[in-house]
């Protein structure tokens, strides 16, 4: 049996003749997630989105919110600092029941993590096959069928890398606000510029708007701030390159479970401020930046 034999028929998804899968509108797209406020976290691969998402979810929970975090990466490591372990993905659990979701119970694919944060790993199809957008859609449908979104105040989507194809842009179809994690360097800012363009394209037909960016693992923010000024964007948080954050990952914990060192307390406070800012942002007009051309970015941030 090949890996492709495990992939269900992707209704509403057609190949383009070049080995890829393109996403088209279908009944699965734009599912209502009830009254929850939905945030989708994007950024260059390896920039720290999962660390940001998990600590953000923890911060929301400490503000008294009922939180659900959904990891949208085949690595399924988005939530392990919240749960202390790697959990099975929705797509793998669906395979076990031959893609009959009616046979599943919430406890089969939802794990309770730090301070009551509910954790789900959507996973993804085998490399080179299927579509991540299908997996996200099926995960949201499953959560709705089990009425898990009705008792949730905040949903955080932690999305794979800086991929801006239709499949991994699927969380944008459910989100109120998109948050971009970047660093104070050319490559991650270049990726952020592309993500901004993708979000702006989705915002034509969906409610998603940009909330701003987080300068992550960066001592300075001058390059991020220069880009934001040029693109009419906004940095809403700064997470320095702290060894305590790396240690928390190694210990499989959020920052809120670490010892009260000075830098840990500072980082916790910044995550609480970020959560408060994002919560308020859904009641305000979203940002409307203008993505820069490649030439403009090179002239602004590139080497002389």
Curated annotation (Swiss-Prot):
[4Fe-4S] cluster binds at residues 131, 165. It holds the Pfam family Fer4_NifH. Binds 1 [4Fe-4S] cluster per dimer. The keyword Thylakoid does not apply. Keywords: 4Fe-4S, ATP-binding, Bacteriochlorophyll biosynthesis, Chlorophyll biosynthesis, Iron, Iron-sulfur, Magnesium, Metal-binding, Nucleotide-binding, Oxidoreductase, Photosynthesis. Its cofactor is [4Fe-4S] cluster. Its EC number is 1.3.7.7. ATP binds at residues 46-51, 75, 216-217, 240-242. It catalyses: chlorophyllide a + oxidized 2[4Fe-4S]-[ferredoxin] + 2 ADP + 2 phosphate = protochlorophyllide a + reduced 2[4Fe-4S]-[ferredoxin] + 2 ATP + 2 H2O. Mg(2+) binds at residue 50. GO terms for molecular function: 4 iron, 4 sulfur cluster binding; ATP binding; metal ion binding; oxidoreductase activity, acting on iron-sulfur proteins as donors; oxidoreductase activity, acting on the CH-CH group of donors, iron-sulfur protein as acceptor. The keyword Metal-binding applies. It is an enzyme of class 1 (oxidoreductase). One of its GO terms (biological process) is photosynthesis, dark reaction. Pathway: Porphyrin-containing compound metabolism; bacteriochlorophyll biosynthesis (light-independent). It comes from the Bacteria. Component of the dark-operative protochlorophyllide reductase (DPOR) that uses Mg-ATP and reduced ferredoxin to reduce ring D of protochlorophyllide (Pchlide) to form chlorophyllide a (Chlide). This reaction is light-independent. The L component serves as a unique electron donor to the NB-component of the complex, and binds Mg-ATP. Homodimer. Protochlorophyllide reductase is composed of three subunits; BchL, BchN and BchB. Belongs to the NifH/BchL/ChlL family. This is Light-independent protochlorophyllide reductase iron-sulfur ATP-binding protein. The lineage of its organism: Bacteria, Pseudomonadati, Pseudomonadota, Alphaproteobacteria, Rhodobacterales.
